[in-house]
Amino acid sequence: DVYKRQDLSFKEELLILLAFLIGFGIKIPMWPVHTWLPDAHVEAPTSGSVILASVLLKVGGYGMIRFMLPITTEAGIYLSEYMIYLSLIAIIYISFVAYAQEDMKKLIAYSSVAHMGFVTLGIFLVFNLLGSNSSAAIIGLEGAMIQMISHGLISAALFFCIGIVYKHSKSRLLKDNYGVAKFMPIFSFMMIFFLMANSG
């Protein structure tokens, strides 16, 4: 109710939405402002990567849901189609970038950007469907929230696994870590389980 009493003009809503997009888009991170995340994960210790992936990235998604949806509804509807295209680019293009990585932490970091693309896709589908199909909009919002929760759990588990591998081999490169299943079969099973969950 408080948000609806603001009586913002469309131009004011658009400016506020752009400010939210800059702040929350960098925090999620959205393509093309995602470049800080892989370097942050590579430089961070395992515990830092776990906290960053499981909690801190979700702040951007929470901010979009909590503030953008109620405050900038009209501007969000206006820009939703463009943001859906950006989200789809993030999902497809960044998945190929992740596939090319040799460092395991960078691989998971880039896959996180692609997964957050699904979150922004769900949020902006809500804007796109408001008024025309409310049940589909609710499904989009629920999907975005479930994706944030599942990504937080799965990526945190993968960064823990990479930390264990690094502790034993002193390398995060894929080429240096062949044959782990021979020495740690249960751990390898768990890591494959989390990798399959990460793939969707």
Pin down the residues of each PLM region.
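Hydrophobic transmembrane alpha-helices and their helix-loop junctions in integral membrane proteins
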Residues: D1-G200
